[in-house]
Amino acid sequence: MGVSPERLAEALRAALRENEKFRKRQQKLSEPVAVVGMSCRFPGGVGSPEQLWDFLVQGRDAVSGPPADRCWDPAALPVSGGGFLHDAAEFDPAFFGMSEAEALASDPQQRLLLELSWEGFEHAGINPESLRGSRTGVYAGVIFHDYAYRLPEPPEDVPGYRYFGSAGSVAVGRLA
C-alpha cells in the first residue's frame, strides 16, 4: 500500500509552503550588518586602521621592551620584551566626564573602550553625541580583571572608584 502521487504532491506543496514561511520569518529576523567605522590600538605604535595597514605592509615587528610607567619593575620581569601599548596611560578624563581620580582608578581597558568607540564613530562620520537617547545597543567583551590587584595602594581620593574602575561589567555602562 503506497502513497498516491496526489497525496505525495500535496505533502510536497505543504512542505514548500512551510519552507517559504520559515524563509520569510528568518529574513525579517536578519538585518544586514555594515561596518562603517573602525578604530584600533596595537603594539608598535599603531593607533588607527590606516596605521595598522601600513604596519602590516611594511612587515614591522611590534615587540618592544616593557613600558617603564607600569606597576612592575622591568628588571624583575622574566621576559625582555612583548607587545605593549606604550600610550595606554594617555587619556583625557575631562573629555569623557571623569575626574582625574576616577581615571587613575579605571582599568586601561575601560579607558581604551571609551577612546576607541569615540574614534570608531568619528571614523564612520557619526557624531557620538547624536546617539544620546537613541535605540543604540552597546556590547563589549572584557577579559582579565587584574588591574585593581596590580595597582599600588591608591591615593585617598581614589578608593571609591577602584572597584568600579576595574569591573568589566561597568565598561559598557561607561560607554552607554
Predicted regions span which residues?
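Heptad-repeat coiled-coil/leucine-zipper oligomerization helices
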Residues: 4, 8-14, 18-21, 25
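Cys-dependent condensing catalytic cores that perform Claisen condensation/acyl-transfer
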Residues: 25-176
